């Protein structure tokens, strides 16, 4: 039982990285391992509602996570405390998907059926990434190759990658589509060397029509894996096969990434996804509620959207937490109940959200620069230096991408923003006067 407990604790550690904080704390944190018999792992859920939700929403993810840890394909069964002694037949386990499927595309467990273009909510922060993804899906290797999508956690990068895979398979069932994380690519590569199966590994990933690889930033520092992926990339690109890559940052900001690999990522199109605005967050909640068959008052969705502005995963997790809380205490959902359900994950006083406009105004006040001059083409020192400071602070104090910052400064290139950030960072190490001026600007922004 101790080994089972260790296995489940390891699984929970990995699952915590894959789901939102509200989802993890609501559904997974309170679960415990009960038994491992033959090919079935039995997990204890705290109540019947949680058991049913875990069964329908997390079985496949848990099975895949266990497989990544152990290499074993286990079925997952959920029980509630009073049913621990019941026969297996009462609640049949969720069948694990076959990981060695020999069909042209991966098993459905690897492409989430919920992640399609139809279920993707388009907003100002993801409109271009969505359009680029759809173009790639409609004409693989002809529109943008590679397509590099970057942005923060839980903003929809993985959703778009799965959507591309689904679209390609739907319109060409014979297409060989592979989706995986860079971590899985690394693990399989290491295992192939250990087991003397490097040729099989290369054949697997160099003979596909579409390669979708998630979280490429985790290749940083892994020299041998980068070497292998470099040759995989070349082989696919030379054969006009589509490559789609996601990361939490643009190629130029991935540390210890080989220059030759970075340059190849820049061959095609690089597009970012930024956090959704209020209208998009409300639309996301409405679509989620409809998909799950939930009747949620509009005031509750507006309340949640105003409180959770970090990413989509946290947003949807908060909605499900409210629904679960309502079910457990048997009360109707309203704004007060939502506030009670989310009190542990919403800070009492949310920090002020600083915009690029706020920064430009504050820097302008300190350096006597007009707002319009930040976007103008003026290069006089009296304007150029404050502009660089404003770019530096925009990078430090906002979640805006490099292209977005450049756009707010008169459509300047993202490399200009990088240069400004590097220059001010360097000066701050020795220039005490600049340190005081930055401190003054920060005081204004508080």
Curated annotation (Swiss-Prot):
GO terms for biological process: DNA replication initiation; regulation of DNA replication. Residues 110-326 are annotated as: Domain III, AAA+ region. The keyword Cytoplasm applies. Its main location: cytoplasm. PROSITE patterns: DNAA (PS01008). Residues 81-109 are annotated as: Domain II. The keyword Iron does not apply. Residues 327-446 are annotated as: Domain IV, binds dsDNA. CDD domains: AAA, Bac_DnaA_C. InterPro entries: AAA+_ATPase (IPR003593), Chromosome_initiator_DnaA (IPR001957), Chromosome_initiator_DnaA-like (IPR020591), Chromosome_initiator_DnaA_CS (IPR018312), DnaA_C (IPR013159), DnaA_dom (IPR013317), DnaA_N_dom (IPR024633), DnaA_N_sf (IPR038454). Residues 1-81 are annotated as: Domain I, interacts with DnaA modulators. Keywords: ATP-binding, Cytoplasm, DNA replication, DNA-binding, Lipid-binding, Nucleotide-binding. It is found in: Cytoplasm. Pfam families: Bac_DnaA, Bac_DnaA_C, DnaA_N. GO terms for cellular component: cytoplasm; plasma membrane. Belongs to the DnaA family. Oligomerizes as a right-handed, spiral filament on DNA at oriC. Plays an essential role in the initiation and regulation of chromosomal replication. ATP-DnaA binds to the origin of replication (oriC) to initiate formation of the DNA replication initiation complex once per cell cycle. Binds the DnaA box (a 9 base pair repeat at the origin) and separates the double-stranded (ds)DNA. Forms a right-handed helical filament on oriC DNA; dsDNA binds to the exterior of the filament while single-stranded (ss)DNA is stabiized in the filament's interior. Domain I is involved in oligomerization and binding regulators, domain II is flexibile and of varying length in different bacteria, domain III forms the AAA+ region, while domain IV binds dsDNA. This is Chromosomal replication initiator protein DnaA. The lineage of its organism: Bacteria, Bacillati, Bacillota, Bacilli, Bacillales. The gene is dnaA.
